Curated annotation (Swiss-Prot):
Catalyzes the transfer of the enolpyruvyl moiety of phosphoenolpyruvate (PEP) to the 5-hydroxyl of shikimate-3-phosphate (S3P) to produce enolpyruvyl shikimate-3-phosphate and inorganic phosphate. The keyword tRNA processing does not apply. This is 3-phosphoshikimate 1-carboxyvinyltransferase. The keyword Transferase applies. It catalyses: 3-phosphoshikimate + phosphoenolpyruvate = 5-O-(1-carboxyvinyl)-3-phosphoshikimate + phosphate. Pathway: Metabolic intermediate biosynthesis; chorismate biosynthesis; chorismate from D-erythrose 4-phosphate and phosphoenolpyruvate: step 6/7. Belongs to the EPSP synthase family. Monomer. It is found in: Cytoplasm. It comes from Corynebacterium glutamicum (strain ATCC 13032 / DSM 20300 / JCM 1318 / BCRC 11384 / CCUG 27702 / LMG 3730 / NBRC 12168 / NCIMB 10025 / NRRL B-2784 / 534).
Length: 430
């Protein structure tokens, strides 16, 4: 179901800037939300203090920081993008999740180690996001939870024993990651077995496993199963990579306008799903190159004369769907995006939302059982609704580069992961 805000509430409209020629720009992208919030969890559960460098400051990461502070964790801002995290006994408290999936799914297992009840709530949309899998998993591990959706209260009473837990994570890989991040603190560790349909967004689970190992935790992996041994999570220094998924709309600007966009400090080795944009843009006709720069690399993308459509299974990279769908709506040939039925449970039902908004601008988008079919069409201006979804908002901005008169409702919803997005975008377009 697409979340529709109260019609009595007037949301601001942003005139998406139209590109008048090829866009050429060199950009630095803020840190990864996914890595920042995982680092915050691991630092809070560690045995010694940690330092986190190049922290992303956004609504989602601020919600995570505030949630951990409400549980008694000391987080000191040494600089705007540098935190010192001092772990300690977790206490009873109240956590505001907003619309952040990482907060509502990563913090309940952490709350199992608090010395009293922890209450969770969030935005209205958050109350309909899937939560049963993670909450049932906690119950099977001996943790008391009083509801199946937000709002709910977690109350463990004493350190849970742990053990084997079966979970259907076909709706979100965050269910697995949430359990894995806290698993070393359970007395006997935790074995997580996924028993549902195809598991989406595997790179995010790989990110979680990689970071746990970097913090000294032993994990054994097999198909749909993770065995996390009990042990001390080591405090350490975490340096956060740029958020590659947040880079994708800017790279799309090169693809749409035939220009060249360079993203600074692109990691040569990463678990971020956003790295897949390199191969996607190549398949759609772009020139893509990693350029050595000092001790690292920049990513350079130059757009084609005519953008080609793409047929792609996006089950592991679902968060890129709004960017790719926007590109597909502007492409010269048909696109088919599959493997993304789970996006119906994201900030909004992204499949229904993308279909509605593309078609309102004259596009031809058909919602499939597990994806989208997007055919070439001549688009026109109009209001693009964001549904309080940051990636829907950036998709509208992409289309606005090539279509006169596109207006994006509530562009500031991008502050969820990229505060000031619209200012950076306008400066890029010029």
């Amino acid at each position: 179901m697409v979340f529709v805000s109260d019609s009595s509430i007037s949301l601001p409209i942003w005139d998406a800037p139209r590109a008048r020629g090829p866009i050429v720009s060199d950009l630095a992208i803020p840190g990864s939300k996914s890595i920042t919030n995982r680092a915050l969890i691991l630092a809070a559960l560690a045995s010694t203090p940690s330092t986190i460098i190049d922290v992303l400051r956004s609504r989602d990461t601020d919600l995570m920081t505030d949630g951990l502070r409400s549980l008694g964790i000391t987080i000191t801002e040494e600089a705007v993008d540098r935190y010192r995290v001092e772990p300690g006994q977790l206490s009873a408290g109240s956590v505001e999740c907003g619309l952040a999936g990482t907060v509502m799914r990563f913090l309940p297992p952490v709350a199992a180690f608090a010395d009293g009840p922890v209450h969770f709530d969030g935005d209205p949309q958050a109350r309909v996001r899937p939560m049963t899998s993670i909450l049932d998993a906690l119950r099977s591990l001996g943790v008391e939870v009083d509801n199946n959706n937000l709002p709910f209260t977690v109350n463990a009473g004493e350190v849970p024993e742990g053990g084997v837990v079966e979970i259907d994570a076909s709706g979100s890989s965050q269910f697995v990651s949430g359990l894995l991040l806290s698993a070393p603190r359970f007395k006997n560790g935790v074995t997580v077995k996924h028993v549902g349909g195809r598991l989406p967004s595997m790179p995010h689970i790989e990110m979680t496993v990689d970071m746990l190992r970097s913090a000294g935790i032993e994990i054994e992996e097999s198909e749909n199963q993770w065995v996390v041994h009990p042990g001390e999570i080591l405090g350490r220094t975490w340096r956060i990579e740029p958020d590659l998924s947040n880079a994708t709309p800017f790279l799309a600007a090169a693809a749409v306008t035939g220009g060249t966009i360079k993203i600074n400090h692109w990691p040569i080795k990463t678990t971020q799903p956003g790295d897949a944009i390199r191969s996607i843009l190549e398949r759609m006709g772009c020139e893509v190159e990693l350029v050595a720069q000092g001790e690292g690399y920049d990513l350079s993308v130059t757009g084609p004369v005519a953008l080609k459509g793409i047929e792609i299974d996006m089950s592991d990279i679902g968060e890129l769907t709004p960017t790719v769908a926007a590109l597909a709506a502007l492409a010269s040939t048909e696109s088919r995006l599959t493997g993304i039925a789970h996006l119906r449970g994201h900030e909004t039902d992204r499949l229904a939302a993308l279909t509605a908004e593309i078609n309102k601008l004259g596009g031809k988008c058909t919602e499939l059982k597990d994806g989208l079919l997007i055919e070439p069409a001549s688009l026109h201006g109009g209001v693009w609704h964001s549904y309080a979804d940051h990636r829907m908002a950036t998709a509208g901005a992409i289309i606005g580069l090539a279509v006169d008169g596109v207006q994006v409702e509530d562009i500031k919803t991008t502050s969820k992961t990229f505060p000031g997005f619209e200012n950076v975008w306008e400066e890029m377009v010029g």
